Structures are given as C-alpha cells and as structure tokens.
Swiss-Prot record:
PANTHER family: AGA OPERON TRANSCRIPTIONAL REPRESSOR-RELATED, HTH-TYPE TRANSCRIPTIONAL REGULATOR SRLR-RELATED. InterPro entries: Carb_Metab_HTH_regulators, DeoR-like_C, DeoR_HTH, NagB/RpiA_transferase-like, Tscrpt_reg_HTH_DeoR_CS, WH-like_DNA-bd_sf, WH_DNA-bd_sf. The lineage of its organism: Bacteria, Pseudomonadati, Pseudomonadota, Alphaproteobacteria, Hyphomicrobiales. GO terms for molecular function: DNA binding; DNA-binding transcription factor activity. The keyword Nucleus does not apply. Represses opine catabolism and conjugal transfer of the nopaline Ti plasmid pTiC58. Residues 6-61 form the HTH deoR-type domain. This is Transcriptional repressor AccR. Residues 23-42 bind DNA. Keywords: DNA-binding, Plasmid, Repressor, Transcription, Transcription regulation.
Length: 258
C-alpha cells in the first residue's frame, strides 16, 4: 500500500495500532512499501509526538503502557508459557536454598512447582504465593507484612521493605511488568512496586527474572533494575526473535523455556 505523504502514512500507523497490540518494523516496510530507515523514522517521530510507544523492533500503542491489573485477570494470560517458565526456574532451586518470591502470577506458577519440595526456606510478599506454599511439609515460610493492595494481593511499602532487609537470600524470583531491551531495563508498574523490588534485589545473591513474551511489547512507569545487573531472565519461546537482535552481552542473560 502506497501513501502519497508522510503525514498520511503516519496517521495510518496510529490507526493500525488501535487494532493491533504490536507493530513490527518488518510489518510496516511490507504494508507501506517503505525502507527500514523510513519505518524507524516514522515510529521515532510518532513516539516524540506521544502517539505511540517505541519498543525494540517496532512500536506499541500508548494504551499498552502497563498498569496494575488484578491477579485474577493476569493469571489466565499466557498460562502455558508461565508454566513452562516456572518449570525451568524450579530446576534452578536446590536443597537448602532461601528463596524470595516477588508477588505476581508468574512467580505464583513457580511456587506451585516448589510447594511440595522439602528443605527450602521461602519468603514472599504475595498472599496467593504464601497460601500456595503452605501445601506440603518440611519447609519454612515467611510472609512479608506491610500495606496490603488487593490489585495483585501483595504487601508493599516501607514496612514491607524493612522486613525484607532482615534476610539473606540465595535466589530471588522477580516479576517484570515489562522489559525494555533497547535500553536494557526491567520495569514495573509503579514507584511503590519498584521500591519493594529493589529492596528484594539488595538482599539476594542471585536474581532470576521471570517474564513471558508479552512483557517485551509493553512499557511501564518505573525502573526496577538493569538487565546487566540480574543473574538470568527466564522467558518463553515467543521472545526468540527479539533476543536474537540484542547485543551478545545481554543475550547471555536469557534462558528460553520451550
């Protein structure tokens, strides 16, 4: 499809994003019969105008910027992918580990895989996660206190951070609302959530980020950590194309669950 002006083409890009979650550079070059450089320039100009959000390899609608969604809603999204990720993460946990689980639906899937394991110590600020871990015997469980939020059924705030800083953790299972591979950032939906996550990172020897492919086509408000500063990011096969395009130094951080 050929458009006579840049303005017409960019207007059509914005229109397409109303119906599609993500527009890749390749999709734009084919649809509009333009070069990669022109497609990138269009997206950059529309990003500057606040009409879309530029992401690695394309763009998302500004309405795709993440906010907290209820756990019940998020639990059904990409369920198979989250279960596959959880299986890989469970294999990284060894007897005697102290494991801190960040509240979230992917970490909840990890808890389900670990609930019957013995000789482990668990800490979590997620109510659903703590409830899941009470299944089975032969382990220790610590529930983080603080201000309760019903949205993701978690405890957060200064009291939660103070409690977390009392521990020495072997492995942290950290959720991500989004991952910006262009800037090398792991993000979450609010400054409050980010502050709790940073407290978790401070006390943990190894940080294991869990994120399905949908987290790579979104944008979030608050930075939790840099990709280079975490141990590993476990994701699903839907991110293979994105991972192949990033620098090798960061690519080594990713483990793909099949």
């Amino acid at each position: 499809m050929v458009f006579n002006s840049t303005q017409d083409r960019q207007a059509k890009i914005v229109e397409l994003l109303r119906d599609e979650q993500f527009l890749a550079i390749g999709r734009l070059t084919e649809h509009f019969q333009i070069s990669v450089a022109t497609a990138r320039r269009d997206l950059s100009e529309l990003h500057e105008a606040g009409l879309l959000r530029r992401t690695h390899g394309g763009a998302v609608s500004v309405t795709q910027v993440t906010q907290d969604k209820p756990n019940a809603a998020r639990a059904v999204w990409n369920r198979a992918e989250k279960a596959a990720i959880a299986g890989v993460v469970a294999g990284m946990i060894v007897e005697g580990d102290t494991v801190l689980l960040d509240a979230g639906t992917t970490a909840l899937e990890v808890a389900k895989k670990l609930a019957d394991r013995r000789n482990l110590t668990f800490i979590s600020n997620g109510l659903d996660i703590v409830e899941e871990l009470t299944r089975g015997e032969g382990k220790s469980i610590y529930s983080v206190g603080g201000e309760y939020t019903e949205t993701n059924r978690s405890f957060r705030g200064p009291l939660a951070e103070q409690f977390i800083r009392q521990f020495n953790v072997d492995k942290l299972i950290l959720n991500a609302a989004s991952i910006d591979v262009d800037r090398g950032l792991i993000c979450t939906s609010s400054p409050v959530n980010a502050s709790v996550a940073r407290a978790m990172i401070e006390v943990s020897s190894r940080v294991i980020v869990v994120a399905d492919h949908s987290k790579f086509t979104k944008s979030s408000l608050s930075v939790t950590a840099r990709i280079e500063d975490v141990g590993v990011i476990v994701t699903d096969s839907g991110t293979r194309t994105i991972i192949e395009t990033i620098p090798e130094k960061l690519r080594k951080k990713f483990v793909v669950a099949n």
